């Protein structure tokens, strides 16, 4: 994934729409699912106008707090999950190497 980044399309007090540049469903679906678990989030929409021509966008509306904070918190939670998976895999590799 080269040069992946966000572009803010629109933002107000309770909502934000973000275009995801150089991202694919592999990362975006877990992000949208994680954002939807946030109690402060009222709505989350993920859409692509045309899969070959347009970048995906997510729209987040919150009941409280800042919408960009909900996205940031979700990214941090996903990061912890993936880091935990890496740690688990490394422990398993060590365990298997010790038993040989």
Curated annotation (Swiss-Prot):
GO terms for biological process: DNA-templated transcription. Keywords: Cytoplasm, DNA-directed RNA polymerase, Nucleotidyltransferase, Transcription, Transferase. SUPFAM superfamilies: RBP11-like subunits of RNA polymerase. The keyword Transcription applies. PROSITE patterns: RNA_POL_L_13KD (PS01154). Its EC number is 2.7.7.6. One of its GO terms (cellular component) is DNA-directed RNA polymerase complex. GO terms for molecular function: DNA binding; DNA-directed RNA polymerase activity; protein dimerization activity. It catalyses: RNA(n) + a ribonucleoside 5'-triphosphate = RNA(n+1) + diphosphate. DNA-dependent RNA polymerase (RNAP) catalyzes the transcription of DNA into RNA using the four ribonucleoside triphosphates as substrates. This is DNA-directed RNA polymerase subunit Rpo11. It comes from Picrophilus torridus (strain ATCC 700027 / DSM 9790 / JCM 10055 / NBRC 100828 / KAW 2/3). The lineage of its organism: Archaea, Methanobacteriati, Thermoplasmatota, Thermoplasmata, Thermoplasmatales.
